[in-house]
């Protein structure tokens, strides 16, 4: 961890960047590359985009197939950043991501290029658009004690404990996300203030003008088909072997990397003595659920411009999205 990131507040990057987001498997990567190529061609190279990954799993080295990192051909089409930052046994916080993101944006702007964030991790998106305050440093003794209580009494008791000090966080945090519940308890204990109160300050932060934040909106049946196809391709490309290789590393995987969709299901199948390939259906189910959560999050961001319905992989649909984004970006450049 960067030593100065745990308690450092981060200002929004809203005014300085382009953002392309959307649920998993919605086609963000290819669309971003098409936009970058089209914008450079339209401006005779005066506006060149560099892409910053907005994905919490792509930061991990060796977690390539399951996180759908850009291929080598895609990486060659535009500079990419914020990929392969840490080892899969490391934890990597939102604050650490934003520390790296701010440094990347500054470097890109100093070289007179255009930074474009591409991805769908909600907490990263929130930090980019509205800023972030990491709060007090971790209290390892307190965390260990709470984790022991969690093992003994279960996550329901942990949620009830959080409800007593921060009912808003208890209601908002995903029911299975013990890590965020513990952090909320830790924050309240250290500051005497619920973390939800602090977050409200950032939720209400807005840029002084309308920005370049785009979201792909894909009809649910089409998105489900894409997810099924993507999972099938991931297993064909060697996702099981990738997970087995990660489990064979000299250090155990971090909690974040072990719980990533696409990895967790195979790890659980191996632990249960089942054939890893049997996890494919669970990966599809959990990926669909992840996409629904992402869509819910995206609806809460008033900054976002919804792109037209991206209903297929056909050239006209993709061309329409590219044209919409490029025209809007150019209108802000005038």
From Swiss-Prot:
InterPro entries: Dimethylallyltransferase, IPT, P-loop_NTPase. Its cofactor is Mg(2+). Gene3D superfamilies: 1.10.20.140, P-loop containing nucleotide triphosphate hydrolases (3.40.50.300). Its EC number is 2.5.1.75. Substrate binds at residues 24-29. GO terms for molecular function: ATP binding; tRNA dimethylallyltransferase activity. It holds the Pfam family IPPT. Keywords: ATP-binding, Magnesium, Nucleotide-binding, Transferase, tRNA processing. GO terms for biological process: tRNA modification. It catalyses: adenosine(37) in tRNA + dimethylallyl diphosphate = N(6)-dimethylallyladenosine(37) in tRNA + diphosphate. The record marks 121, 143 as: Interaction with substrate tRNA. ATP binds at residues 22-29. Monomer. Belongs to the IPP transferase family. NCBIfam families: miaA (TIGR00174). HAMAP family: IPP_trans. Catalyzes the transfer of a dimethylallyl group onto the adenine at position 37 in tRNAs that read codons beginning with uridine, leading to the formation of N6-(dimethylallyl)adenosine (i(6)A). This is tRNA dimethylallyltransferase.
């Amino acid at each position: 961890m960067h030593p100065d990131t745990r308690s450092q507040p981060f200002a929004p990057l809203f005014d300085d960047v382009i953002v392309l987001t959307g649920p998993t498997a919605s086609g963000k990567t290819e669309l971003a590359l098409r936009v970058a190529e089209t914008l450079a061609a339209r401006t005779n190279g005066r506006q060149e985009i560099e892409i910053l990954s907005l994905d919490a799993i792509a930061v991990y080295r060796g977690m390539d197939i399951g996180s759908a990192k850009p291929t080598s051909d895609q990486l060659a089409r535009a500079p990419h950043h914020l990929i392969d930052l840490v080892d899969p046994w490391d934890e990597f916080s939102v604050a650490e991501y934003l520390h790296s993101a701010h440094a990347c944006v500054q470097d890109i702007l100093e070289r007179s290029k255009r930074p474009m964030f591409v991805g769908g991790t909600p907490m990263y998106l929130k930090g980019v658009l509205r800023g972030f305050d990491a709060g007090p440093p971790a209290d390892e003794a307190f965390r260990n004690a709470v984790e022991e209580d969690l093992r003994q009494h279960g996550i329901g008791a942990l949620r009830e404990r959080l409800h007593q000090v921060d009912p808003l966080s208890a209601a908002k945090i995903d029911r299975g996300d013990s890590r965020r519940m513990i952090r909320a308890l830790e924050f309240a204990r250290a500051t005497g203030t619920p973390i939800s109160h602090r977050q409200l300050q950032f939720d209400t932060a807005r840029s002084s003008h309308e920005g370049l934040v785009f979201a792909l909106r894909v009809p649910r049946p089409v998105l489900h088909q894409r997810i099924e196809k993507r999972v099938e391709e991931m297993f064909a490309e060697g996702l099981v072997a990738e997970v087995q290789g990660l489990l064979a590393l000299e250090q155990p995987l971090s909690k974040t990397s072990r719980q990533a969709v696409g990895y967790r299901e195979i790890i659980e199948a191996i632990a249960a003595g089942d054939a890893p390939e049997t996890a494919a259906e669970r990966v599809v189910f959990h990926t669909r659920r992840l996409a629904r959560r992402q869509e819910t999050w995206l609806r809460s961001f008033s900054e976002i411009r919804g792109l037209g319905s991206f209903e297929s992989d056909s050239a006209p649909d993709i061309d329409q999205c590219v044209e919409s984004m490029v025209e809007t970006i150019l209108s802000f450049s005038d």
